[in-house]
């Protein structure tokens, strides 16, 4: 005889889990979207407001701003376990704002139309890869490890090209960069989905959603920068 009570209970639990997972992922994407919005506002403000523009591009302060996000990211991920929710949120927003100031130089190199077009293309690619990572039943761990190693190789190649200044190597690293970050978006999304098992509605769960949003934000920004090398139209 079929135990319908047990079946209904299991179905109810699965439904509750699915709804909780959707809320968790929505929170992650909302954090990420707000960070991207803050980045855009910071970039536009830096270019548009004369005192900030002068500070960024005509003083040594701009160099500090350029490297500050790297320090914040290292501190965030290395010290994440020890920091509270408020600190994690503040660091994320500060990082997004400083990144916007750092990337404002793109408006001096590329046309606004091509920047907007690349952003929407990047958003579409990100959405497709994140959806794949969320919905696939395939374990992406091995693929993620491959792309993580590819990222290390990409960093090394980029550093080498600072001295070689090879256009061919630059083209190759840009193309590889697009592929690597497309793969990382899918892998990171799957990891974030699995993080829900240990995330609750307490502060730990809130912190994990911030870290997840930070990770996807970094994937998006890097994919955008590599796409700009191919799709950006330079100003005359």
From Swiss-Prot:
Recorded topology in the membrane: Multi-pass membrane protein
Keyword field contains Transmembrane: yes
TM annotation in the entry: 32-52, 61-81, 90-110, 115-135, 144-164, 167-187, 208-228
Entry-linked Pfam families: Bax1-I
Main subcellular localisation: membrane
Location in the cell: Cell membrane
GO CC field: plasma membrane
Record's keyword terms, sorted: Cell membrane, Membrane, Transmembrane, Transmembrane helix
Origin superkingdom: Bacteria
PANTHER family, A to Z: BAX INHIBITOR-RELATED, PROTEIN LIFEGUARD 4
Family: Belongs to the BI1 family.
Protein name: Uncharacterized protein RP147
The organism of origin for this protein: Rickettsia prowazekii (strain Madrid E)
């Amino acid at each position: 005889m079929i135990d319908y009570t047990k079946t209904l209970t299991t179905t109810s639990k699965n439904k509750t889990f699915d709804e909780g997972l959707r809320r968790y992922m929505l929170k992650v994407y909302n954090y990420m979207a707000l960070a991207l919005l803050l980045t855009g506002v910071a970039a536009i403000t830096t270019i548009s407001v004369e005192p900030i523009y002068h500070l960024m591009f005509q003083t040594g302060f701009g160099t500090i701003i350029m490297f500050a996000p790297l320090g914040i990211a290292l501190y965030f991920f290395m010290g994440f376990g020890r920091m509270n929710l408020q600190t994690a949120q503040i660091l994320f927003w500060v990082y997004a704002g400083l990144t916007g100031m750092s990337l404002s130089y793109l408006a001096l190199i590329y046309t606004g139309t091509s920047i907007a077009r690349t952003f929407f293309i990047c958003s579409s690619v990100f959405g497709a890869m994140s959806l794949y990572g969320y919905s696939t039943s395939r374990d992406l761990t091995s693929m993620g490890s491959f792309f993580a190693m590819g990222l290390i190789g990409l960093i090394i190649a980029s550093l080498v090209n600072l001295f070689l200044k090879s256009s061919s190597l630059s083209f190759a690293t840009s193309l590889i960069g697009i592929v690597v970050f497309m793969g990382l978006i899918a892998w990171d999304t799957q990891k974030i989905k699995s993080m829900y098992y240990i995330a609750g509605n307490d502060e730990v769960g809130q912190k994990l959603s911030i870290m997840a949003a930070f990770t996807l934000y970094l994937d998006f920004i890097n994919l955008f920068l590599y796409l700009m090398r191919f799709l950006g139209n330079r100003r005359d």
